[in-house]
């Protein structure tokens, strides 16, 4: 009974929309779902990074790894915006393509993530990330088709990907490699979240629109 009352405002909103607004309503839902998924994925990436850091990485190694050349992420090798101000200067299609590039660069590495941490504190988090990443990928592909006349063109940089996580957690080099990968994953998911929020905010005026 309660669910029926909850649907009424939505149905009334669609009923009183102009034809253009009715066409935009599904697009609003697509953006909303994508933003929610990106926020959740970014939070999961941050949680697993913190858990890994706390469990495996001494304080002195944390500082040295952040200044290491190996800490440079793939997203920094392509012309992707670094923050919301730069993102606002790009078109929606560009931001969607950058988002898709970043997501697809993690598809292969994240297939092994749960095996790497199968006996650790972060297993419960890592086991869900791959599935959620695929969900977000599908959502962004759908958005791109809606906005870019149904035929998204794949840029050359989409073929690049990160290395896979190392399963040998007793090796210092392997630990630091995984630590660097998790840092990049967190950074890249934050960028995807920012891009999607920028697009949604400038397409749909909302009182709670924050970046």
From Swiss-Prot:
Residues 1-23 form the signal peptide. Keywords: Disulfide bond, Hormone, Metal-binding, Secreted, Signal, Zinc. It is found in: Secreted. This is Somatotropin. Disulfide bonds join 73-184, 201-209. One of its GO terms (biological process) is animal organ development. SUPFAM superfamilies: 4-helical cytokines (SSF47266). CDD domains: somatotropin_like (cd10285). The keyword Disulfide bond applies. Growth hormone plays an important role in growth control and is involved in the regulation of several anabolic processes. Implicated as an osmoregulatory substance important for seawater adaptation. Pfam families: Hormone_1. Belongs to the somatotropin/prolactin family. GO terms for molecular function: growth hormone activity; growth hormone receptor binding; metal ion binding. Zn(2+) binds at residues 40, 193. InterPro entries: 4_helix_cytokine-like_core, Somatotropin, Somatotropin/Prolactin, Somatotropin_CS. GO terms for cellular component: extracellular space.
């Amino acid at each position: 009974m309660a669910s029926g009352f909850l649907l009424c405002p939505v149905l009334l909103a669609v009923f009183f929309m102009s034809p253009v607004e009715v066409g935009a309503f599904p697009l609003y839902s697509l953006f909303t779902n994508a933003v929610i998924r990106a926020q959740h994925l970014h939070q999961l990436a941050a949680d697993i990074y913190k858990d890994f850091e706390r469990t495996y990485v001494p304080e002195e190694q944390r500082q040295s790894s952040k200044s290491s050349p190996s800490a440079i992420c793939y997203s920094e090798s392509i012309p992707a915006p670094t923050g919301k101000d730069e993102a606002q200067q790009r078109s929606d299609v560009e931001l969607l393509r950058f988002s898709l590039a970043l997501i697809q660069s993690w598809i292969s590495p994240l297939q092994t993530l749960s095996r790497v941490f199968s006996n650790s504190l972060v297993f419960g988090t890592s086991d869900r990330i791959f599935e959620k990443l695929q969900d977000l990928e599908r959502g962004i592909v759908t958005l791109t088709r809606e906005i870019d006349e149904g035929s998204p063109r794949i840029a050359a940089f989409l073929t690049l990907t990160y290395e896979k996580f190392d399963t040998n957690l007793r090796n210092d080099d392997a630990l630091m490699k995984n630590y660097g990968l998790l840092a990049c994953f967190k950074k890249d998911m934050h960028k995807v979240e920012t891009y999607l929020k920028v697009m949604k905010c400038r397409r749909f005026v909302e009182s709670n629109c924050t970046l």
